Amino acid sequence: VFNVTIHLVDLLSSNTLVQMARKVEEGASVEVIDWDQKTKSPSMPITLRQNQKKRGDGPLTVLVTGSTGNLAKRVLPVLEANPLVGKIVCVAVRDKPNEASRSILRGDKIVQHAGDLSAPRLGLTTEQFQGLSNEVDVILHMGALRSFWDNYHILRLSNVESIKELVHLAAPNRIPIHFMSTSGVLPRDVLGSAAGQAPSSAAAYEPPLDGSNGYVASKWAGERILERAFESLGVPAYIYRLQPTRALSSDTSKSWVLDEFVRCVDLTAVMPDCTGWEGHIDLIPGREVAERLGEALISSTRRTDVGEAAKAQLTRYDSTVTVSVDDIETHLEELRGMRGFDPVPVLKWMGRIKAVGFSYVLASLEAMLTNGNGGEKLTMWR
């Protein structure tokens, strides 16, 4: 067994066993993960303990991560339109090449800070970090690396350490933190058999000790850190899991989402290459999620019963429609196959259509990547 971590895309791009062996040799050595140790609540920094400040009744300041993502394109306009919100502080903003990503940060209420989720203080200076700890009223954490195949060790800095930094910022004034997680933190049989009664905490379902299924493992760790920060520091925590629908998708809802794929194909002039992919995706209209999140953010700043709650608060958003890879491929081929659009790998295609305003957000997916002979290579649930 090789106790190393490697970007899977690097391994799959190796054409020979010699090249694969070289990638293994170059991989970073990793240890078995002690999940209890890795998800301990951060302590409150001494530099922030002395800066506690009572908040007034003026317009709210909302801190947002993941502000150039697909969901943020729906959330930021909702927050800007709310008269109770005076300022939206977008942190850990990394430069993106396309204009659509930058344009959503140009609202009158938006202040942006360049940075990186993987950096200490999210790339903010000590003074900026302390200032926001006193200014911010509520935090919405949507930022994460969403690599489909990478190990937890590769995603840890961006997806887990960033949450600890937000706890540091929130703790002095007990600023509510709203965290976008995934239903993948629960085993499929637990989620599927619960009929709406899935456990609110995923604490009992630790991820693999080797860090495999890294994205889901990082979300599980994030939930646990926030749960424990609530217990030890009193930081209000709100966790959101987008999950598969429990009802059959209507023909109308499937038609709407398939037509949305067609619209995005026309805008990008590329088609998805689904070779080797099987499975399905569960989707929710982005506007619906954004409006519900906006209401929850405002509501959490007014709550007086947070200290009486026994645990972090969980909210589930059920998807409204499920479509299979075959559904997507067949529909697009029938309506746009004759136009000669260039095919691109399906994951890259999803990124392209998000960039041009795909109006749904991914609630969950179950996918299998097979080789050319139909043999199973990789299975993913998130």
What positions do the PLM features span?
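N-terminal Rossmann NAD(P)H-binding glycine-rich loop of SDR-like oxidoreductase domains
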Residues: 55-84
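Conserved Rossmann-fold NAD(P)-dependent oxidoreductase catalytic core, especially the SDR/UDP-sugar
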Residues: 138-141, 149-150, 157, 161-214, ...
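NAD(P)H-binding glycine-rich loop region in Rossmannoid oxidoreductase-like domains
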Residues: 106, 110-161
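Mid/C-terminal beta-alpha module of Rossmann-like enzyme folds, strongest
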Residues: 292, 296-371
